[in-house]
Every structure is written in C-alpha cells, then in structure tokens.
C-alpha cells in the first residue's frame, strides 16, 4: 500500500504550484481581460461544467472507491476498469453531442466562446484520473497536473495580450486540461488491461455510478448554479467579481480536497479489508483537527489581508471583491470538517444515502438563498448563500456520522484553533491600518506576521492541549513516514 504521507506530499507539491501560478497569471488576466470578459468566460464555463457533470456521471468517486477495493487483484481490476470506462466513453460522447446541439439552438450571445468550452466537456471522455486515485498512484496525477499548469502558464503570457483574446484564453484554459487527461493514457497498458466487459457488469457499475451521480448533482447546484443565477439576475460583471473572489479561496482549498482525495482510497481499501474499525476512527479524529487547523489558518488569513490583497492582486477595478472574499473565505473550516467526514466515513462505508441527503439539503438551502438574496445584494448575496450552504452540509453530515465518530473531543480542539485564527485576524487587521509602506510590502508583512503568530499559537495549543507533547516530538511525528 502506497505511503499516505508521500501521496499527500505529492498533492501538496501540486497545490503549491497551483498557488504560485495564479499569483503570476491572475493579476495579468484580470487587467488584460477586464471584469466583463472574465464574466463571459466564467458564465460560459459554468454552463459547460453542468454538461461535464452529467458526462462524468459520478464516475470519479465510484471509480476511485471501486478500484481501491480491488487494487491488489489484477484480474478484478481489469474487469472493473473496463466496465467503468465503457460507461464513461458512451456518456462522454452522448453529452458532448447534446452540448453542441444546445449551443446551436439556445445560445445567442457569445456563441463562439460557448463552442470553445466544448473542449472542456470533451475532457470527460479521457479523464481516467479515478483509476490512479484508486490505485493510490498520486505521483502520476500530480505530474500530469504540473505539466498542464506550466503549459497553460506559458501559453497565457505568449498568446493573450488584450481583451480581444478571450477566445484564445478559453482555448488555453480548456485545451490544457484536455492535454493533461491525455497524458494519463501514456503507458496505461502497464497498469491495467482493457477486457471485454459483460452487460451485467456494466449494469452493476452503472448503478453504482448513478448513486454517486446524485450527490454530484447536488454539489454542482451549489458550486455552479450560483454563477448561473448571478449571471442571469445581476449581470456578468457581478459574476466576474464573485468568480475572482472564489478563485482566491479555491486555490488554498486544494489543500483540503487533496487530503480527501488521498484518504478516500486509503479508507475504502481499509473498509474492504475489514481493518477500518478503531484504527479508522482514530485516523479520522486526528484528520478533523489537522484539517480544521489548516483551513482556519487559510480562512482567517485570507480575510485579514483581503483589503490589501485585492488591489495588489487584481487591480482597483476589482475592489468590490473585498467583502465577497472576506465572507466566503470563512466557509473553509466547515468544508474541511465535512470533507474529512465524507471521505473517511460516509463514502468508504457505503453510507451513500446519508451522503446524498446532506448534499441535497445544502443544495436546497443554496437555491433558496440565492434566489432571495442575489436580486438585492448581487454578488454578496451569492457569497452569503455559499457560506450558509457549506455550514449546512457540514452540520448534516456531522449528525449522520455521529454514531461512528465521537465528535466531542475533536470539536473542542477545533474550536481552540478557530479562536487562534480569530486572534490572528484581529492582529493583522490592526496591523494593516498602521503600516505605511507600499502595498506589496504591506501585504508581505501582514502575511508574515499573521502566519508566524498562528504557527506559534497553534503549536503551543497542540503540544499543550491536543496531544500534550513537546514541539520536538511533534516535528518527529510530522516527518515520520
């Protein structure tokens, strides 16, 4: 079984790159494209993403879980892969065709950009990342992602120069993703063999995909529909503000989702082998504290520097992003907690019904709040709805998992880290109003002081309360394989 820490480090390596590259490209793109063009891109991308969601059919989670359960049985692995990929190929072709018809019949404005977004939909045909996730071969997927990011970076600076290059920007964004998926096919025959699947096998896998597709619908409702509703009710410029603020939160969010991506196949394999039990519960409790602590540092850190960060990062045209960023960044601790519960408890234990219910409750909250708040508060209304949705999903999943995981102790520890985050926020907030250097230097000082303060207080709290160990022992635990 692959090393968890090594896999997570692979993911962290990619996330660091994912943080650095947008820091380079986003300020350039925001100035070159402008809020309206970015709104057009975001709106068309959101619509294409709805079709991509249908094409994927819940295959990512179902495929990863199914592969993890048979990763040591090559014959069974070949069968499972062939059955699931057959479903993926058929649905990918079908949905791509439907998307093209949709563009021809219903899209009247910016039709060419919508057409270019079809490349994004086509990626569903070739994405076999779920296979390598299930095999816990994260080195392969991380290498792919790094190549994609670098190709996209150099292409943006080479070919995108003014507001007339929106089409080129769309091709780069979608084409690089397609290229990344295609690279996973190199040397695939050394990993798995395609065998002729049986109709019964395909049917059984299809049922599993549909089960995982249902929560995908709910997730898409409250991660994509907000932009669609915002574009329809408040205009594309408001979508641009909301989307740019969301992107700043989405980058560090990768640290949270990467942890879940690594833990899902590990916990699924433990469940299949019958070794989940007390060991799994202990891992989950530690994961809750670790991920909420990390998410709290990111969340309160982003909120505290938002007034300095936005003008430096995006320019004065995007000052409206400041309150949006401050609000939606607060959702991260809730997302971290819920991510641990679903990837380490609900999904590995096949508690799909509870998982689905929690997401649809969140989707209902999201749609209602967006419909009520966007007409009056525009992008801020969407931000309020997003925060409320993530908090609701977190609460419902916690209620469903309380019979498996004793939450009292990890919850108390997490509250301690949240208090530390609040202290960091207050200090940086006051500091930001006293610094008189240039904007970039002010930002660096705020990040440095806030980060150092959080680390000192967090280590003291962890060693004094959570584990009651010395800092030296904590470092050894972190470095231990």
Q: What do the PLM-derived regions correspond to, one by one?
A:
Residues 3-60, 153, 173, 210-237, ...:
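Signature of the first transmembrane helix
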Residues 4, 139-142, 166-173, 182-223, ...:
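Interhelical loop/hinge segments that connect adjacent transmembrane helices in multipass membrane
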Residues 27, 56-72, 245, 249-288, ...:
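Helix-loop junctions and terminal segments of transmembrane helices
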Residues 27-28, 39-56, 211, 226-228, ...:
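Alpha-helical transmembrane segments of polytopic membrane transporters and translocases
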Residues 118, 143-190, 208, 249, ...:
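Hydrophobic alpha-helical transmembrane segments
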Residues 121-145, 330-361:
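Membrane-interface junctions at transmembrane-helix termini in multi-pass inner-membrane proteins
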Residues 429-481:
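Membrane-proximal transmembrane or re-entrant/amphipathic helices at the cytosolic face
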């Amino acid at each position: 079984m692959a090393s968890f820490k090594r896999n997570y480090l692979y993911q962290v390596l990619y996330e660091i790159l994912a943080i650095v590259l947008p820091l380079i490209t986003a300020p350039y793109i925001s100035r070159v494209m402008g809020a309206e063009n970015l709104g057009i891109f975001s709106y068309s991308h959101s619509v294409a993403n709805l079709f991509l969601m249908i094409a994927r059919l819940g295959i990512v989670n179902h495929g990863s879980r199914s592969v993890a359960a048979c990763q040591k049985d090559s014959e069974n692995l070949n069968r499972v892969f062939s059955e699931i990929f057959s479903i993926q190929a058929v649905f990918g072709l079908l949905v791509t065709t439907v998307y093209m018809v949709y563009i021809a019949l219903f899209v009247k404005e910016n039709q060419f950009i919508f057409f270019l977004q079809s490349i994004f939909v086509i990626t569903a045909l070739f994405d076999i990342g779920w296979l390598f996730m299930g095999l816990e071969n994260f080195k392969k997927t991380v290498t792919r992602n790094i190549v994609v990011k670098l190709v996209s970076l150099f292409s943006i600076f080479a070919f995108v120069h003014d507001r007339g290059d929106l089409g080129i920007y769309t091709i780069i964004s979608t084409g690089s993703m397609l290229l990344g998926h295609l690279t996973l096919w190199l040397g695939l025959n050394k990993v798995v063999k395609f065998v002729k699947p049986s109709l019964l096998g395909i049917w059984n896998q299809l049922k599993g995909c549909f089960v995982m597709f249902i929560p995908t619908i709910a997730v898409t409702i409250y991660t994509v529909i907000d932009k669609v509703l915002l574009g329809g009710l408040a205009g594309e410029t408001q979508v641009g503000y909301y989307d740019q603020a969301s992107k700043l939160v989405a980058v560090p969010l990768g640290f949270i989702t990467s942890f879940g991506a690594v833990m899902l196949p590990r916990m699924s394999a433990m469940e299949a082998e019958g070794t989940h039990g007390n060991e799994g519960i202990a891992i989950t409790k530690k994961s809750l504290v670790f991920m909420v602590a990390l998410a709290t540092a990111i969340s309160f850190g982003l909120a505290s520097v938002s007034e300095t960060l936005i003008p430096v990062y995006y320019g004065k045209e995007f000052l409206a992003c400041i309150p949006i960023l401050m609000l939606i960044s607060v959702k991260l601790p809730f997302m971290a907690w819920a991510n641990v519960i679903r990837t380490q408890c609900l999904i590995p234990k096949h508690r799909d019904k509870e998982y689905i219910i929690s997401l649809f409750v969140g989707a209902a909250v999201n749609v209602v709040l967006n419909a009520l708040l966007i007409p009056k508060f525009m992008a801020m209304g969407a931000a309020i709805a997003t925060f409320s949705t993530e908090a609701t999903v977190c609460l419902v999943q916690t209620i469903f998992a309380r019979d498996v995981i004793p939450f009292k102790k990890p919850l108390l520890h997490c509250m301690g880290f949240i208090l530390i985050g609040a202290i960091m926020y207050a200090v940086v907030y006051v500091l930001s109003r006293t610094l008189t250097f240039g904007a970039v230097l002010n930002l660096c000082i705020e990040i440095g002081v806030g980060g150092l303060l959080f680390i000192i207080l967090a280590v003291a709290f962890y060693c004094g309360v959570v584990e009651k160990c010395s800092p030296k022992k904590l470092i050894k635990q972190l470095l231990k394989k």
